[in-house]
Amino acid sequence: MIPVRGLEGRKVAVLGLGRSGLATARALEAGGAEPLLWDDSPEARAKAEGQGFTVTDLTRDRAFEGVALLVTSPGIPHLYPAPNPVIARAMAAGVPVDNDIGLFFRSFATRDWDAFDQMPRVVCVTGSNGKSTTTALIHHILSEAGRPTQMAGNIGRGVLDLDPARDGEVVVLELSSYQTDLARALTPDVAVFTNLSPDHLDRHGGMGGYFAAKRRLFAEGGPDRAVIGVDEPEGLYLAGQLSVAPEDDRVIRISSGQKLERFGWSVFARKGFLAEWRKGRQMASIDLRAMPGLPGAHNHQNACAAYAACRTLGLAPRQIEAALASFAGLPHRSQTVGEKGGVRFVNDSKATNVDSAAKALQAFPKIRWIAGGLGKDGGIVALQPHLGSVVKAYLIGHSARDFALQIGATDHEICETMERAVARAAEEAQPGEVVLLAPAAASFDQYPNFEKRGEDFMEKVKALL
């Protein structure tokens, strides 16, 4: 646990009692604060009381008298589409609002600098797609190289549940826009921006607000080194804003398709090979085609980001290459479930938006595509240029009929359920084809989350193998 510093003897309100909320309460208590907990759910409140915490109704009048800070869980809106009433009440009372990420940065190793021979460092990864894989890959590479490391944030443990800092340790955090948007302190040593595509726009008031939330990680006084994906306009802009000149090697530009040889430091992938260039010289080349856990151009971008971050931490190219080869990938992200009769079944349930689905569709030459769910703003019209590899689409969920109208002349069948979609795709697939779940939609019409959707797909596939 990371005890929260600087709030000793103060009352701190905690809103939202899921994993991060309860971890925050424990860390506040360990640091000497007095946490006051609230959640709209009676079950969550009862669980907190059962663990010995004080539950206080933060919706009542004058609830914030004497309260020094409100700490809120990332899923609770503080501005758009409308502030949560408790957060609005805190703001009206002049009480500052933070989250567990902000508390982590104000507390991690801050009183122990003289205890370390080699300072602990923090790497943060944000972006629309590839965050989890990049975070897990950095952690895996560091572990394989023998470096002490922990992983947390939007993946793994809550940040305040981490163990206290060790000498020379690297903490790798995946941060969503919900987490970066509200944190009052964001001071990573290395920050990674993978890419940007429309997502969570209702929570940020539009694309500009969404980008602004991600960009906070790179604010003045932020990272010593920035790793920026420049395959979209926002990444190009961010890299330019952070650089004093093209040769500035404090910014490492990465790409999964462009040559970036003219910059001070760059890492890019083309035709299956990763190349590192620094000050006009090629420093390394790695063949990514044989890496089983990193199929497709989108995973090559993840590999470039992880490689660049680990190079800034002092790892050698060959150390990184060996670790890339042993990376198994993450569940529900280009995950091979099995193969039968020359047909491969791939679970990419995490492809919940158009951009991530497009990258999944580019990874294989002949695809039986299972798509659908709860569609997002704009539908999937933007996927039309990427449908050349799709032999047939099998559409499920709430958006099935809308998707059928948006995929043009692509052969398709409305299946409604995962069970029928898997059965029909498996029945019609030919040797050399891939049955791919890449929904391009949220899961909430039929499943509680994308993980459960992916598990259902895998269960149906394994029954056929």
From Swiss-Prot:
The record lists its disulfide bonds as none
Kindly state which reaction or reactions the protein catalyses.
UDP-N-acetyl-alpha-D-muramoyl-L-alanine + D-glutamate + ATP = UDP-N-acetyl-alpha-D-muramoyl-L-alanyl-D-glutamate + ADP + phosphate + H(+)
> Does the UniProt entry include the keyword Transmembrane?
no
List, in alphabetical order, the Gene Ontology terms for molecular function in this entry: ATP binding; UDP-N-acetylmuramoylalanine-D-glutamate ligase activity
A biological process from GO: cell division
According to the lineage, what is the superkingdom? Answer: Bacteria
| Binding-site list for ATP | 127-133
- Please state the Enzyme Commission number of this protein: 6.3.2.9
**Which pathway does the database say it acts in?**
Cell wall biogenesis; peptidoglycan biosynthesis
Q: What is its main location?
A: cytoplasm
Q: Which InterPro entries does the UniProt entry name for this protein? A: Mur-like_cat_sf, Mur_ligase_C, Mur_ligase_C_dom_sf, Mur_ligase_cen, MurD
**Localisation:** Cytoplasm
Carries keyword Kinase?
Answer: no
Q: Which UniProt keywords apply?
A: ATP-binding, Cell cycle, Cell division, Cell shape, Cell wall biogenesis/degradation, Cytoplasm, Ligase, Nucleotide-binding, Peptidoglycan synthesis
> Which GO cellular component terms are attached?
cytoplasm
The UniProt entry, under NCBIfam families, shows: murD (TIGR01087)
User: What job does the chain carry out?
Assistant: Cell wall formation. Catalyzes the addition of glutamate to the nucleotide precursor UDP-N-acetylmuramoyl-L-alanine (UMA).
HAMAP family referenced in this protein's UniProt entry, alphabetically: MurD (MF_00639)
Q: Which family does it belong to?
A: Belongs to the MurCDEF family.
Protein's name in the database: UDP-N-acetylmuramoylalanine--D-glutamate ligase
